[in-house]
């Protein structure tokens, strides 16, 4: 996004930080379901949930070497989590993560736009309201 043409809140939705946070949210949601289904041990899920994180600089560094954004992201997350990270991304493709995370970002951006439209609607309905001005 071009910063000078973007509202700060909308820029945040499309930031690298939020993109990776959305990816992590998707990965954690899948791990949680696998745990509920008994496919990930509860102790490993607890470790994943408690330790999962990422470092954007590290992701960039790894991506420069492996030339794959999701592998770079997963490697960074694995460095935070440790051995239990073997369950992260289990049975998933890169598209599963990217597409779902994009949907989360689109929903967030859409909600923001709708809230802005609500303000415009309220302003418009009060446009002809008589007001008293003091000079």
Describe the residue ranges of each PLM region:
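Single conserved hydrophobic/aromatic residue that forms the stacking wall/gate
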Residues: 126-135
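A helix-coil-helix interface module used to build multimeric assemblies
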Residues: 1-127
């Amino acid at each position: 996004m071009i910063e000078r043409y973007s509202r700060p809140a909308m820029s945040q939705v499309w930031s690298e930080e939020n993109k990776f946070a959305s990816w992590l949210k998707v990965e954690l949601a899948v791990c949680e379901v696998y745990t509920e289904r008994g496919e990930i041990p509860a102790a490993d899920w607890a470790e994943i949930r408690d330790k999962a994180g990422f470092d954007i600089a590290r992701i960039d560094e790894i991506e420069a070497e492996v030339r794959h954004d999701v592998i770079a992201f997963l490697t960074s997350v694995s460095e935070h989590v440790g051995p239990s990270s073997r369950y992260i991304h289990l049975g998933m493709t890169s598209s599963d993560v990217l597409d779902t995370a994009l949907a989360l970002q689109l929903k967030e951006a859409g909600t923001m736009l709708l809230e802005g439209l609500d303000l415009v609607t309220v302003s418009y309905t009060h446009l002809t309201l008589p007001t008293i001005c003091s000079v």
